Amino acid sequence: METTAAATAAERRRPLFTTEELGGRAVYRVQAATVAAGILLVLYYRATRVPAAGEGRAAWLGMAAAELWFAVYWVIAQSVRWRPFRRRTFRDRLAERYEQNLPGVDIFVCTADPQSEPPSLVISTILSVMAYNYPSEKISVYLSDDGGSILTFYALWEASIFAKKWLPFCKRYNIEPRSPAAYFSESKVHHNLCIPKEWALIKNLYEEMRERIDTATMSGKIPEEMKLKHKGFDEWNSDFTLKNHQPIVQILIDGKNRNAIDDDRNVLPTMVYVAREKRPQYHHNFKAGALNALIRVSSVISDSPVILNVDCDMYSNNSDSIRDALCFFLDEEMGQKIGFVQYPQIFNNMTQNDIYGNSFNVSYHVEMCGLDSVGGCLYIGTGCFHRREILCGRIFSKDYKENWNRGIKERGKENINEIEEKATSLVTCTYEHRTQWGNDIGVKYGFPAEDIITGLAIHCRGWESAFINPKRAAFLGLAPSTLAQNILQHKRWSEGNLTIFLSKYCSFLFGHGKIKLQLQMGYCICGLWAANSLPTLYYVVIPSLGLVKGTPLFPQIMSPWATPFIYVFCVKTLYGLYEALLSGDTLKGWWNGQRMWMVKSITSYLYGFIDTIRKCVGMSKMSFEVTAKVSGHDEAKRYEQEILEFGSSSPEYVIIATVALLNFVCLVGGLSQIMAGVWNMPWNVFLPQAILCGMIVIINMPIYEAMFLRKDNGRIPTAVTLASIGFVMLAFLVPIV
């Protein structure tokens, strides 16, 4: 008996997860130290070689300010690179200890617009998270529909019927992925793993369902006979509008009802539709408000101790993701500290060379791992498992013991209608009035980047977080497939993050004394995206104008002072390339990423910066734009061919075209004047500026093609080209003094 007890105790001491420091840190630290020395020399040179008035002093000081900012941001970025580590889980140990006592999991899926986020896409995500390799009776799925659309409700009702066949099929053949849309799109890979007749039957059922849903979406209405299938359809009457309607909570599958079973007679997960009450006179707080509504609704239906939230386009790609996350929460030694577990946001529609720089590979393989080593990764708004208690404001305490069995007990005497009525009362417009919801309880309000500020608040309450990036991606979604979508998304992100930085929730202020300095700095990497806009815009415009106007802004190439400039640029660039290749990018993908960083800095981040400043002085109100998840056929084809998509006369395209054209004209004009000896100065005085201008021209080659060579509908419109020519002519009137 003693031997058995000792063996059991030893088994429980075996960790459910381990950490492993990433390699190559010695090389990194040498690189960082030498680059830091080079940066100091560059700044010293700028400070001690200021030209006389009228000889480019203002431009020189502007260059010094831009380089000082780049130096500060570089230091901030190094905070997460000093000691990053990777995590590994042990699901077999989890099963040995907890298989009979696994906690319940509530899964939140949010959608806002059936046009930008088609219902057929939403239900594929819903079906994928219902089919986890996890006891179905312990899974509850909640869909928040901020569009309040009968089309989305209809699609969810269709999914509740199809789930009876889909879930047994998934578990019988242990298929991956468990999104029907993704699975059948990879049919050539999976077809031979199943009985052909059964595979064909399920595929036909899915395609018929999707066609019914898509037909209804295109027509904007559902067949009248369908409205008789479920009482929930009665909620939509003639007075119902998107921004003015009553609250709706409908339980489509009651997982605690013994009759809610699939075709193999196994219990189905609970499925709930939620549409918050909307009234014109009440602010609904966007996605943060939707998540808080789901927290309350789920508390009276399933009340599971673990909550997963995913965006409606981020389907489950790994059926063991719940078990991996639980390895962190349930670890006997370290799990008590962990408040949330974050998976990366990975996209399945990436082109081979990531034309729009959507991959975030370096962020996930380096930066998030580095944040993990200093107290916790960021909460990025999707693919995240939380303890319910931390979303309800709990402060970390060593004495706190989680009740992992909450929500599993059988329901009392309340019937489903009473439960729905009770839940509906929790999502009215007035429920949160004079409460701490959105402040100390739930997801934070008042910021477009509600995920970042909520994660920071959790860390400041003493909790840590864990980042896990398994070989098989846990979630896959849709990246923006046009330049306009990409610019919009990054504008929203950068604006939200800068708003946080400029508020009382700045990580240096709010986190002082609560989280490590490195973590405070780590939050600023994304918090200061928008602040890179003006220095970047300055650096891609002023040196080029100086080249054509005969104003040198760098040491001549033969001077010893040119060495730190060259060293910092080359080593930073090469190490960035090394990180990108190590993280899975291609060489061309890295190059595309450099272009997109410049494009985002002078458009997305610039707009985000301006809008944030406007908001700070009371000139505009916070808004939220939904990034479209679908593109037209021609746009999709050009995306697959890795051709940049323009096609409209948006102001941001004018900025991009102007910067590209300005550098081309300055390069040609500047070199012509140097060769002609116009400036009466040695040619090597202007060589650094010519090299910088030339690199900007090379990186903008796709822009020139879109302006002058392409004939497709995705080219830069003639109006944009003409406007950019006009702005270039105006730029030459700017004196470089």
Swiss-Prot record:
InterPro entries: Cellulose_synth, Nucleotide-diphossugar_trans. Its EC number is 2.4.1.-. Its main location: Golgi. It comes from Oryza sativa subsp. japonica. The chain crosses the membrane at residues 26-45, 58-78, 528-548, 551-571, 654-674, 683-703, 716-736. GO terms for cellular component: Golgi membrane; plasma membrane. Belongs to the glycosyltransferase 2 family. Plant cellulose synthase-like E subfamily. Keywords: Cell wall biogenesis/degradation, Glycosyltransferase, Golgi apparatus, Membrane, Transferase, Transmembrane, Transmembrane helix. It is found in: Golgi apparatus membrane. It is an enzyme of class 2 (transferase). GO terms for molecular function: cellulose synthase (UDP-forming) activity; cellulose synthase activity. It is a multi-pass membrane protein. One of its GO terms (biological process) is cell wall organization. PANTHER family: X-BOX TRANSCRIPTION FACTOR-RELATED. The active site is at D146, D451. Thought to be a Golgi-localized beta-glycan synthase that polymerize the backbones of noncellulosic polysaccharides (hemicelluloses) of plant cell wall. It holds the Pfam family Cellulose_synt. Signal peptide: none annotated. This is Cellulose synthase-like protein E1.
